[in-house]
């Protein structure tokens, strides 16, 4: 009779969740800080909006480029390691089997059973067995550079749109408090949601994200105000 594993572990979603949260958080903080900094320097309303729009595009493209390069490098490294394993298997299959069995012994399996497991796994897919258990490379989660780039860019754009739309809607006289308030609210919601999905404290998650967002906005607004007086 088949046994189904019904548990849904949070680690299964932590990868995409972390990327989405980081992207949206970066979009909110960077764009809100830019808008507040330019507004504090006494720029015109249209100038503030243009700066925010430029920040959204620049942030999304920067994140997309960074993710693409990072994940592509990971994919290149994994391919090189798998190619090296394939050469090792061709040169010394017995030695590679003993190496794989040693990994299982280190995990607590009886040596004789570990050797049998290694033998059967290598008979089924020798390269896959070594890639998974020796190198930690999973065929279920291959690196996808384009997907990672688009996901990160989208998350940044969605996050950045919140303070930007606020800056577009509210009048210039109320821009700074409204943008700051809306951005901090969304940061708190984002931090709390991510903490809840990851099984952590919602309050701590919300406070952590909000604190660093508020700090970034305050510093940028202060710098903008300073240069606004000097210029």
Protein language model annotation of sequence segments:
Residues 12-23, 45-53, 113, 144-150, ...:
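The feature identifies polytopic integral membrane transport proteins across all domains of life
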């Amino acid at each position: 009779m088949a046994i189904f594993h019904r548990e849904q572990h949070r680690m299964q979603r932590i990868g995409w969740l972390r990327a989405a949260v980081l992207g949206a958080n970066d979009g909110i903080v960077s764009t809100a800080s830019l808008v507040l900094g330019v507004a504090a320097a006494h720029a015109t309303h249209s100038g503030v909006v243009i700066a925010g729009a430029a920040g959204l595009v620049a942030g999304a493209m920067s994140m997309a480029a960074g993710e693409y390069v990072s994940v592509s490098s990971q994919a290149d490294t994994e391919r090189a390691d798998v190619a090296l394993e394939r050469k090792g298997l061709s040169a010394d299959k017995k030695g590679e089997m003993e190496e794989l069995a040693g990994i299982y012994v280190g995990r607590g399996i009886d040596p004789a059973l570990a050797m049998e497991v290694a033998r059967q796994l290598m008979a089924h897919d020798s390269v896959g067995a070594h890639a998974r258990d020796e190198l930690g490379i999973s065929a279920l989660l291959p690196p996808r550079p384009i997907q990672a780039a688009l996901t990160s860019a989208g998350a940044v754009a969605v996050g950045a749109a919140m303070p930007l739309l606020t800056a577009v809607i509210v009048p210039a006289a109320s821009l700074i408090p409204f943008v700051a308030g809306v951005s901090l609210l969304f940061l708190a919601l984002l931090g709390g949601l991510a903490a809840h999905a990851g099984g952590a404290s919602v309050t701590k998650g919300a406070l952590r994200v909000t604190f660093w967002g508020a700090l970034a906005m305050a510093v940028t607004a202060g710098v903008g105000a300073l240069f606004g007086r000097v210029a």
